[in-house]
Amino acid sequence: MPKVWAAVLLVVSLLPQPAWAITLEQVPNPRRQYGGWVSDTANILSSSTENELNRLITQLEQRTSAEMAVVTVPNTQGYATPKDFTTQLFNYWGIGKAGQNNGVLFLISVGDRRVEIETGRGLVAILPDSRVQQIIDQQILPRFRNGDFDGGTLAGVRQLTSVLQGQPVANVPAAASGVTTSTIATSSGAVAQGIDSSLVEGILLLLGIIILG
C-alpha cells in the first residue's frame, strides 16, 4: 500500500467515528449495576468524585425520597437532540418514585458539548427551570470551561441536592470565564447549556497525543 494512503487511513482511523454513538440500552443503569447513582460512560469523572456524588444523592433520597442520576456519555448521535436523548433516558430508567415524579437526570454529553438537566413534574415547584439555569450558569459551566469536570459536576449536584432538601443556597458565582451561557432549550422541565468548544477540542487533542505518542 502506498505510504500516502497508509497515512490517510491512519488519520481517518483516529478521527471520531459514528460507532461512538451510544443507545439508551447501552448506558449502564447504576441502580441495577451497583446500587449507585452515577454512570460515567465518557470516563471524565474520578473515582473519588463518583463516591461523593453517590453519597450526596443517597442522602437526598433518604431524606426526601427524590432520586437523581448523573450520566456522562461520549455523544448522543442517533437522536434528534441531546435533550431528546436525555428525556428518553429519564423515562426509560423511570427516575423518581412511582406516582411522585420526583426524579432528576443530570447528563453531560462531551461530544455534543452539552449539559442537560431533566426534572420530574413533581419537583417543578421547588426546582423550576430558572433555578436550574442559575446553577448551570454559576456553578457548572465555569468549571467545565476550565477543564474541571469533577468540580463542575460536584458543584452542580451539591446545589441541586441542597435546593431539593430545602437548604439555603449561597448565590455565589464561580470564577468568571468565557463560557457561552445562552440557553438553547428550556422546556418541559429540562434545561440545556452548551460547553465551550475549546474544551472538547482540547480533550480530542489530548486523545490524539496519547494515541500518537
Which residue ranges define each predicted feature?
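Bacterial N-terminal signal peptides
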Residues: A6-Q17
